[in-house]
């Protein structure tokens, strides 16, 4: 076929045959606060077009609250509000070590998630029916994962991202991290939240805090490996007081396509750890 012989009428005829407006979609990217009001007023054949919203990773979300001016709100403001809500910076800094244990059920098996933290080292263990399934240890120097008898050191770019969250209460470390940014407000499960984000080389984490209580209600961790993002979500609720510090007694955590509901069963402040706890 000779493309020079194609006429405007030919293009219109083919378009009318193969392009059905009822199945059409318009994809718009950009700064939402500058676009949304204009998009809401788009009228086609006497009807306003329906609008769907997606996050940076293509996941469908509720309509975010978009404002041009957040009155000077910063990531540091949000973090400080959270730290004050759970006990206050002075109280939190008096805790040098901590052990936290959650229990839940998945696929007919009992699941235990246990965290042991020092200021410069963290151990996360997952047990299924009493058997250790996975353990990850992160320090300032390295990070590794153990599964059964196998131990694998994580690459430097993984470690660089993971060590950003070191500390008994990681938000204290994040206060002075120049890479964490306030990205706006959203609605999560009918709750208005502040969103802050830490974008890493491999692992990026989005933290969501209740605007009014200051408490953290959700974390979304996205790991990008070879162009394939893996998303893990954790929800937090029903905070309880342990010696003057609030901890979420309910935690929902994604495990593959499933979500595990977990309950807080133990919190120990300033325990003594052995070297084995971090090996």
Predicted regions and their residues:
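Flexible, processing/modification-adjacent segments and terminal tails
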Residues: 70-77, 84, 140-204, 211, ...
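Short, surface-exposed beta-strand/loop micro-motifs that present aromatic residues
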Residues: 14-17, 113-116, 246
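N-terminal mature ectodomain segment of secretory-pathway/periplasmic proteins
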Residues: 76-150, 176-182, 187
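Solvent-exposed coil/turn segments that connect beta secondary-structure elements
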Residues: 29-33, 44, 56, 105, ...
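Extracytoplasmic
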Residues: 6, 11, 21-24, 34, ...
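Mature, solvent-exposed C-terminal subdomains and processed small-chain segments of exported/organellar
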Residues: 1-95
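Gly/Pro-enriched, hydrophobic low-complexity segments
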Residues: 132, 191-278
């Amino acid at each position: 076929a000779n493309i020079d012989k194609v006429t405007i009428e030919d293009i219109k005829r083919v378009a009318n045959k193969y392009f059905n407006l009822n199945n059409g979609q318009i994809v718009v990217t950009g700064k939402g606060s500058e676009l949304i009001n204009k998009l809401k007023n788009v009228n086609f054949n006497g009807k306003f077009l329906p609008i769907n919203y997606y996050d940076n990773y293509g996941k469908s979300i509720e309509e975010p609250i978009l404002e041009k001016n957040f009155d000077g709100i910063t990531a540091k403001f949000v973090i400080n509000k959270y730290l004050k809500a759970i006990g206050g910076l002075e109280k939190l800094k008096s805790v040098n070590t901590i052990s936290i244990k959650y229990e839940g059920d998945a696929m007919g098996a009992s699941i235990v998630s246990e965290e042991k933290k020092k200021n410069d080292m963290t151990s996360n263990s997952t047990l299924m029916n009493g058997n250790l399934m996975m353990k990850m240890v992160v320090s300032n120097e390295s990070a590794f994962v153990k599964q059964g008898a196998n131990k694998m050191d994580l690459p430097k770019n993984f470690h660089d991202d993971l060590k950003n969250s070191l500390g008994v209460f990681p938000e204290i470390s994040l206060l002075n991290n120049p890479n964490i940014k306030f990205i706006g407000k959203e609605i999560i499960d009918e709750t208005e939240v502040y969103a802050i984000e830490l974008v890493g080389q491999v692992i990026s984490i989005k933290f969501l805090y209740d605007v009014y209580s200051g408490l953290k209600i959700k974390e979304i961790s996205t790991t990008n490996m070879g162009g394939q993002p893996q998303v893990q979500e954790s929800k937090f609720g029903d905070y309880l007081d342990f010696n003057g510090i609030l901890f979420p007694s309910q935690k929902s955590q994604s495990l593959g396509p499933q979500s595990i509901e977990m309950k807080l069963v133990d919190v120990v402040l300033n325990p003594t750890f052995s070297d084995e706890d971090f090996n």
